[in-house]
Amino acid sequence: MAGLKKSTIGSGYQFVFASTDASTSTGSIGTNYNGDNVIYFRDDLISLNLTPNAVFRDLSAWYHVVVALDTTQSTASNRAKMYINGTQITSFSTANYPNQDTEGSINLVSGSYVHRIGSYNGSSNFFDGYLAEVVFIDGQALDPFDRDWET
C-alpha cells in the first residue's frame, strides 16, 4: 500500500514500484500517462494485469493505493485486488488474473528480482510525484482500512 500524488501529467510509464529481473519480467504498480492517466497493477511473471477504467488526473489529490495478491484463492478475481482511496476497483479495461497457486515476482523467494520504489530499473521511468507510507506486507492480505489514510 502507498500514498501517491502526481506532480505532472507527462507521457509514458512512471513506476511507483517495480520488481525486475535480467530478462525484464516485471511486477509493478505504476501510472501510465500515455493519455490514459491510470494506476495499474501487473506482474508479467504470472500474467497479471489490472488496469482500471477510472482515470486519475487531479494533481492536487493524494491517492491511497492498496493492491492485494493471494493466488491461493479459488476464484480468479479474488486472487488480485486493487483499492484506491478505500474503494475496491471492479471495473477494468484489462483484467488478467494469475493462475491459482502461482508465485509472482513481487517478494519472490527464488530468482534475481530487484525491487525498486519510484523507478523501473534505477535509471528510467521514475515516478514524478510524491510517495508516502509505502508498505509491503508478506504472508497476509490486509483489508484496505487496516491503516488510516486521508485524501
Where in this protein do the model-derived segments appear?
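Short tryptophan-centered beta-strand motifs in secreted/extracellular beta-sheet-rich domains
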Residues: 2, 60-71, 82
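Extracellular glycan-interaction patches encoded by glycine-rich segments
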Residues: 105-131
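Short, solvent-exposed beta-strand-to-loop segments that form ligand-recognition rims
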Residues: 84-112
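Short, aromatic/His-centered strand-loop micro-motif at the edge of beta-sheets
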Residues: 41-64
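Short hydrophobic/aromatic patches on beta-strands that form ligand-binding or substrate-lining surfaces
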Residues: 1-11, 65-67, 117, 131-136
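Extracellular glycan-recognition modules
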Residues: 1-40, 73-76, 140-146
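Beta-strand-rich, repetitive solenoid scaffolds
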Residues: 17-20, 27-34, 39-43, 68, ...
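Extended recognition patches within non-cytosolic domains
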Residues: 74-76, 93-96, 130-151
